[in-house]
């Protein structure tokens, strides 16, 4: 039985790695795998740049176009699109969210990339 630890919060990476290591130290039939590749935000951003030619310049907030694009692909309400458009703030780090179909398409591709990247890391960690 495999227990796989993945997460998208930087503050949780060490704890997940420690949990997997502790489980493995106990022996037994369960094996823990910590998969840091899921949290490869630099890789996600690089894929966005190379695939779509979208480059961000941080505005100093804890916000990224690529992350909002993935959120929009799952549920556009989470990026408050209508409110942003009405307030004249429909961009993140200099990249427009208008029209909404564009960040949704970008988000879908980035989620596919992240999924493939993570699955490859899991398979490698399992020796497959």
Residue ranges and their predicted role:
Residues 1-128:
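Extended, histidine- and acidic-residue-enriched regions that form the cofactor-binding/catalytic faces
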């Amino acid at each position: 039985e495999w227990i796989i630890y993945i997460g998208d919060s930087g503050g949780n990476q060490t704890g997940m790695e420690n949990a997997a290591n502790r489980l493995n130290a106990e022996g037994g039939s369960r094996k823990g795998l910590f998969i840091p590749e899921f949290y490869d935000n630099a890789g996600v951003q690089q894929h966005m740049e190379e695939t779509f030619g979208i480059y961000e310049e941080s505005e100093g907030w804890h916000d990224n176009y690529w992350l909002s694009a993935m959120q929009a692909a799952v549920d556009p309400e989470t990026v408050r699109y209508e409110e942003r458009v009405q307030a004249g703030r429909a961009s993140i780090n200099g990249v427009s969210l208008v029209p909404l179909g564009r960040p949704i398409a970008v988000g879908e591709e980035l989620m596919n990339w992240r999924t493939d990247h993570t699955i490859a890391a899991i398979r490698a960690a399992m020796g497959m």
